[in-house]
Regions:
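Short coil-to-helix segment of the ABC ATPase nucleotide-binding domain corresponding to the Q-loop/switch region
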Residues: 93-100
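Helix-to-loop junction immediately C-terminal to a conserved catalytic motif
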Residues: 56
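Catalytic Walker B motif of ABC-type/P-loop ATPase nucleotide-binding domains
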Residues: 158-161
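A short, proline-enriched helix->beta-strand linker immediately N-terminal to the Walker B motif
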Residues: 152-156
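Conserved ABC transporter NBD signature motif
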Residues: 64-76
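The feature captures the beta-strand-to-loop junction immediately N-terminal to the Walker
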Residues: 41-43
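Conserved ABC ATPase "signature" region
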Residues: 104, 111-129, 181
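Conserved ABC ATPase signature
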Residues: 133-137, 141
Length: 271
C-alpha cells in the first residue's frame, strides 16, 4: 500500500471564549492517499471547518501536525488548493481572468496563462462563458469558476469546505457529478468537508464520521459502489444502506449538538 499524500497526526485545537475554553478538536488523525476522494462529515459544531482551516494553513493547531508527501507543513502550502463555501470569485475579473489568477501571480505571460486557464475553463464546462463576469453567472457557475481557478494552480491536494452548500439540490447533484468527473480525469486527491450525507456517499471512496465536540474521527466508512455514481446507483439499496450506516453513527452526535445549543440558550447573559 502506498504512503498517504496527506497525513493529519493527532491534531488538537482549543478556543478560549468569554464562557471558558472550548475543545474543538481532540487528537484527530486522517490519512488520504494519492487519487483518493475522502469526505469528512459530522454534526454542526464538531470542528469540521476548524480541521479544514488547520490543514489549509489558515489556523494553527495546539498540538499534532499536518504532513504533505511525508513532510510537515506549517501555514499555507502550494501543494494544497482550497475551495470555500463562500463566494470567492473576483467580481471585477472575467471567468478566464479569475481562473488564470494563480498563473498571473506565478509570473506567466498573458498568452501562456490564458491558454492554460482555458483548459480548466473547458474542464468545468464553462467554455463559451470565459469572457463573462461573475455577476452574469449563476451560483453554480461561479463555484465552477472558483474550482477551475484552484485546479489551475495544479495542487497535489484539493481541499473543499462545503462548496455546494449554498446551491439548490438539483445544482448540487449536477456539480457533484461534474466534480467526480474532473477529479477522476486529473487523478486529483480530494478532501471534502460536508454535512450532507448523500453528497458524502455520492462522491467519496471513504467517509470519515466525526464526533461532536471535541471532534475526532469516530468511524471510517468505505464506500464500495460503482462509478460513475449515476441516478441508478444513487437510487440503489446499496446507496441507501450507506446512508443508513452513516446516519446511525451521526445521530447520537447530532443530538449532542442540539443539546449544547439548547444549553447555551438557557445560560444567563454575561454580566
Amino acid at each position: 500500500m502506498t504512503a498517504p499524500i496527506l497525513k493529519v497526526e493527532r491534531v488538537a485545537k482549543t478556543f478560549l471564549t468569554e464562557s471558558g475554553a472550548i475543545e474543538a478538536l481532540a487528537e484527530t488523525s486522517i490519512e488520504v492517499r494519492q487519487g483518493e476522494f475522502v469526505a469528512v462529515i459530522g454534526p454542526s459544531g464538531c470542528g469540521k471547518s476548524t480541521l479544514f482551516n488547520i490543514i489549509g494553513g489558515l489556523e494553527s493547531a495546539d498540538g499534532g501536525r499536518v504532513l504533505v508527501g511525508g513532510k510537515p507543513i506549517d501555514g499555507s502550502h502550494k501543494d494544497i488548493g482550497m475551495v470555500f463555501q463562500e463566494e470567492s470569485t473576483f467580481p471585477w475579473r472575467t471567468v478566464i481572468e479569475n481562473v488564470a489568477f494563480p498563473l498571473e501571480v506565478a509570473g506567466l505571460g498573458r498568452r501562456e496563462r490564458e491558454e492554460k486557464a482555458m483548459r480548466f475553463v473547458r474542464l468545468v464546462g464553462l467554455d463559451g462563458f470565459e469572457r463573462r463576469y461573475p455577476a452574469e453567472l449563476s451560483g453554480g457557475m461561479r463555484q465552477r469558476t472558483a474550482l477551475a481557478r484552484t485546479l489551475c494552480a495544479e495542487p497535489r491536494i484539493l481541499l473543499m469546505d462545503e462548496p455546494f452548500a449554498a446551491l439548490d439540490e438539483q445544482t448540487r447533484m449536477l456539480l457533484g457529478e461534474k466534480l467526480i468527473e474532473i477529479c477522476t480525469a486529473l487523478k486529483q486527491t480530494t478532501l471534502l468537508i460536508t454535512h450532507n450525507l448523500s453528497e458524502a456517499v455520492q462522491l467519496s471512496d471513504r467517509v470519515l464520521v466525526m464526533s461532536f465536540r471535541p471532534g475526532r474521527i469516530k468511524r471510517v466508512v468505505e464506500i464500495d459502489l460503482p462509478r460513475p455514481r449515476t441516478s441508478d446507483v444513487i437510487a440503489s439499496e446499496g446507496f441507501a444502506g450507506y446512508l443508513g450506516t452513516i446516519w446511525e453513527e451521526l445521530k447520537a452526535e447530532a443530538a449532542k449538538g442540539l443539546q449544547a445549543i439548547e444549553g447555551q440558550k438557557r445560560m444567563p447573559p454575561p454580566a
